[in-house]
Design a protein with these regions (language model features):
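Active-site substrate-recognition segment that forms the wall
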Residues: 22-26, 82-86, 194, 199, ...
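Short beta-strand to alpha-helix junction loop
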Residues: 64-67, 92-100, 139-158, 285-292
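Glycine-rich FAD pyrophosphate-binding loop
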Residues: 25-45
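Dinucleotide-binding Rossmann-like beta1-alpha1 core, especially the glycine-rich loop
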Residues: 50-126, 135-136, 256-257
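Beta1/beta-strand and adjacent pyrophosphate-binding region of the FAD-binding site
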Residues: 2-16, 32
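Helical element adjacent to the flavin cofactor pocket in flavoenzyme catalytic cores
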Residues: 140-198
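C-terminal catalytic lobe of FAD-dependent flavoproteins
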Residues: 298-387
Length: 387
């Protein structure tokens, strides 16, 4: 087995890993990025045409970070000369008397993001394709939209190579068998290489706990199911007419649904955000249950009836990696300044990934944000997080 040494190793070439590689390469840092599957694969959490981006968060800490997250994507677009953000507008709605809408509106106000708060009846007049219960609480954010997910990951990998030249190396289809932390430097072991590195960033998603089994917080990988509907009349669901949406239930109806317009030839994406039973990420299961499809159709019948009977012409699965509190994990390993872990994202991290790549580069190089104070990252993202 060959032994090599390098300065920066990143494990995992999804949203977080590609962003970290891009940001490090822009700074002139050598980067070795290792991915167990082919680049652009659909086995993890970063594939698919699009993801929602929005300032609309009920948690004020995430809402405060979203302007910086939007700015990070703008910087990527300027560097690449291509767009990844698609402005569609976004609507968040919830039952009357539930504090979700009030929290979202208050947080948008606090960060200075334009928005309108209204009743379900008001919203149905604005966009008649919806049939939201009249008393529901609705918040509309004009600047919410979508991120071209697969394109964004590919662009960051391309730019990492452009900025880094020969100093950027990408190793696809290369599983990491173990990480040795017994010596003075982290050592990454593949089937053919032993790699000693000055700094190791682990952005391996659902495989993080396999590579770092002694993490002090339990992480759970769950399989998510996504549906794409093909309505007979697509016009009301096109970008410019149909916004991204978030529905948050309350009481006995604690369901959390989301959706977005068709993009790059896909149908209308609708799914339930749900932390289900734990799954083994190495066991590939692409089935989507009929019962799940009926749950989603039931939601549509009550809120977007014109879509409820549309055929499903595509299904996808992906993985969430979830912490018990559903926050992110971005931190140094305890007692190590040379090993950084950046996962899970608990099902809502893609919109932050370009920003987190910048933070990871700061942490790895001792840059201006390496203490993370300047970006006000959450104490809840640390391994030793508040209970």
């Amino acid at each position: 087995m060959q032994s090599i040494a390098t300065r920066n190793v990143i494990i995992g070439a999804g949203a977080m890993g590609s962003a970290a590689a891009y940001r490090l390469a822009r700074r002139g840092e050598p980067v070795l990025l290792i991915e167990q599957f082919p680049l652009g694969h659909d086995r993890g959490s970063s594939h698919g045409a699009a993801r929602i981006t929005r300032h609309s968060y009920a948690d004020p800490s995430y809402a405060r970070l979203m302007p910086a997250a939007f700015q990070a994507w703008k910087e990527l677009e300027a560097d690449a000369g291509q767009s990844v953000y698609i402005r569609t507008g976004g609507v968040s709605f919830s039952p009357a008397g539930f504090d979700y809408g009030a929290c979202v509106a208050a947080n948008l106000e606090s960060v200075g993001v334009p928005h309108r708060r209204m009743t379900g009846a008001d919203w149905n007049r604005v966009n008649p394709i919806f049939s939201v219960p009249a008393t529901h609480d609705v918040v509309f954010e004009p600047d919410a939209g979508m991120l071209a997910a697969a394109r964004a990951v590919a662009l960051q990998l391309e730019l990492a190579r452009t900025h880094g030249g020969e100093k950027t190396q990408v190793m696809p289809s290369t599983p990491v068998r173990r990480i040795d932390l017994d010596g003075t430097r982290p050592v990454v072991v593949t089937d053919s290489l032993t790699i000693a590195t000055d700094r190791l960033i682990v952005t391996a998603g659902a495989w993080v706990k396999h590579l770092l089994p002694r993490l002090p917080i339990p992480l759970v990988a769950t399989r998510q199911q996504v549906l794409y509907f093909r309505p007979s009349d697509p016009a009301p669901f096109r970008i410019g007419r149909f916004p991204v949406f978030i529905f948050k239930g309350s009481g006995e109806d604690e369901a959390f649904f989301y959706g977005m317009p068709g993009f790059l030839g896909t149908g209308i994406k609708v799914a339930r955000h749900f932390v289900g039973p734990e799954t083994d990420p190495d066991v590939e299961d692409r089935t989507v249950a009929d019962a799940y499809c009926e749950i989603v159709r039931g939601f549509l019948r009550n809120h977007i009836p014109a879509l409820a009977g549309a055929p499903i012409d595509l299904t996808e699965t992906c993985l969430y990696t979830v912490a018990p509190d559903e926050h992110f994990l971005v931190d140094f390993l305890p007692g190590r300044s040379d090993v950084i872990v950046a996962s899970p994202c608990s099902g809502h991290g893609f919109k932050f990934s370009c920003l987190i790549g910048q933070v990871l580069a700061d942490m790895a190089t001792g840059g201006p944000g390496h203490e993370r104070g300047e970006l006000d990252l959450l104490p809840a993202w640390k391994l030793a997080r508040p209970s």
